[in-house]
Amino acid sequence: MSFYVPGISVVIPSFVSGAVGTDGANLVDMKLYSALASLAKQSIRKDLVEVLVVLNGDGVSSTQTNISREFDQGLTSQFPELNIRLLRSLTPGAGRARNLGIASARRRFITFLDDDDALQPRYLESGLKEADDGVVTLLPIVDTIDGHSFRDNSLNARITTLRGTTAPIASAPWVLGFNASKIIPTEIAQKYRYDELLRSGEDVAYFAHLLEISGLLLRTPKVGESSAYVRTIRSDSVSRQRESFDFNVTQRLECIAQLRTINEVAPKHRALHTLEESQFGFVKSYLKSHPDDTQRAIDTAVAIGVPGLDWEGLRREKANRLVFSYCFPPYADTSANVTAKVIRNDAELVDVYYADMERVRGRDESTRLIVDPFLVHAEEIDAVPSFAHWGAICSYARQAARKAAKRAKGQDGYDSMYSRALWSGSHVAAALFKSKHPGTRWEAEFSDPLSVGVDGTPRSGELTRGVTTYQMKKLVECSDWREISYSTHFELTELVTLLYADEVIFTNENQQRVMLERYPEDLQSFVRSKSTIRHHAVPTEEMYHLVEADYELDPKRINIGYFGNFYANRGIGDVLTALEHHPHADEFLLHIFTSKPEQLSRELWNHPAFSRLRINGYMPYLTFLNVATHFDALVVNDTDTSGSTFTVNPFLPSKYADYVGSGVGVWGITVDESPLSKLPLTFSSAAGDIEQACSVLDELLRQARYNAR
């Protein structure tokens, strides 16, 4: 059952300047009267029309007097045939005014009219005749410039091509880029609001919400004469503002940020992408005329929170550094995030080649905010992603190395190159490039041992024949250690990297020892001489605030955070057991962020400490960084290698680096002589030692009570 009265509501926002005459004559610009006069001339029955005039601006306060009543009476008496409702908003802005008008609309359909525009006499009759539920009706538009009308404008030409058609709204996204010429069901209009913070482009952001409605149609009827919207073109209109960084860049990026909050129901049409590209077109045009503002524009996009825009071709600088990163933002992966942190810490312009990881990894678009300021060229390689399949790895490596070589040729090469594994394809691509460009300095980082797995046994990886295999083997044969044997592609990749990288980066000394001890002493010495021990990259300070999270903590309790997979018999299980037995356990709250929160909740449902837990799913990386800054303590646990073949524990959790930059106390649950146990920790307990874990809770409680004094 519809609660709307038959007919159409016409919403007219009208700005009222603070500079008004005492007689009220200048309260509203005279152009409003022209708009109302065009409504008075409509051929439709007037009882089917309600006119909502929304006065807004500083001058509205002056109308809350006798003058206001006189003005209202004067307006309605001048247009007695119109059902005019006058609404007022002290806050200026067409978006706010339209929101007030939309919320107040009572008729079944709604349309918008700017106060300096007009409607031809048959506009409402023609539009209402074709209007229907689930349909947006599009009508012609003519331009008026200095009193002269022009039907042959670019927008009307596009509307003309649709005459007589009914199609999905997403098939013509350009229709959503303006307020005029549309009649929509009021029920749909009232589902959404104009963004009142946008200084321009609020019409695009508002109408783009229609892409969220399944099955919504666009109807463009064949209408007769005198059925067009009459748009007044002025040099000072919002859409025709003088070119400036604020309007052409900042405001367009703000609009794009709003567009990205919309969930498109038919993404195959790429309608949202089209609207975004239209907005970004303003940015590109401006930067082509003002190339020195390019870095400022990119930094503005990052500050606003708009990642992944196509800045390539707008920079004048070239990158002197090449990066091969098999997994890279926007793909959600620890390796991708660490490489992004390295790039941001280095603060050097780079070209990056990475693999299409769509089949095996989700996307975290926000992580591009980390690297966007430093990307000159970022190219995704079309290859089947695989951790261990040699053919798939080689496909990426060959393509990436070839494309990088072509780009290097066009810009006098690269000074340096960085690759990181795990995801061994990064090192394979770098090795192929290095073989053809020996003058490029290669920095190769190992996050973990490559040739062996977490238990210390060799990783299985069949080394099949092929061009890449031949090239990699040839590199070994041309070295001073051609006699070293290898049986898997992981072993071959590790060996070639150790031989040819100009700098080999290990995350800790144990890892360096474990990786090198399988090789001859002279090779070990050779690699050590060019090695660097560098812990996982710590996020820069601003990275913790690139995204603001709204996760709530309990201000009356001590909040402990744990991000990672949960194993009751390892590490974090110690905290759970300590909470079970601590005499003041109710003063603590353990927040767990894990990959399978529902499963973990079921497993721990009957645990005595369950009431002290908050179990959540994983967060996007930058959201996690921001949330991490609000805890009282963050828990990181060691990898237990007691049942492995390792002589020492080679694993340093990358999470430690993320925690240590947060400014929050880090609680390490460690095993003897591990890399983590040798790093600065605010709190520490040995894995499996519940008494020590309880002591950490005691210390947290003492700190909380001291700070509360």
Please report, for each region that a protein language model flagged, where it lies by residue:
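N-terminal subdomain of nucleotide-sugar transferases
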Residues: S2-V5, L48, A301-P373, E503, ...
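Nucleotide-activated donor-binding/catalytic signature segment of Leloir-type glycosyltransferases, i.e.
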Residues: Q73-R85, C478-S479, T594, L600-H630
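Short, acidic, metal-binding catalytic loop of nucleotide-sugar glycosyltransferases
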Residues: D29-L48
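Glycine-rich, basic loop-to-helix element that forms the pyrophosphate-binding segment
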Residues: L86-A105, E541, L546
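Catalytic core of nucleotide-sugar-dependent glycosyltransferases
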Residues: S227-R234, R240-R270, D293-I304
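Conserved donor NDP-sugar-binding/catalytic core segment of glycosyltransferases
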Residues: R122-N153
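Acidic donor-binding loop at a coil-to-helix junction in glycosyltransferase catalytic cores
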Residues: R199-Y206, F651
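Conserved catalytic-core segment of nucleotide-activated headgroup transferases in glycan assembly
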Residues: A19-K31, A266-R270, R534-N606, I615-L622
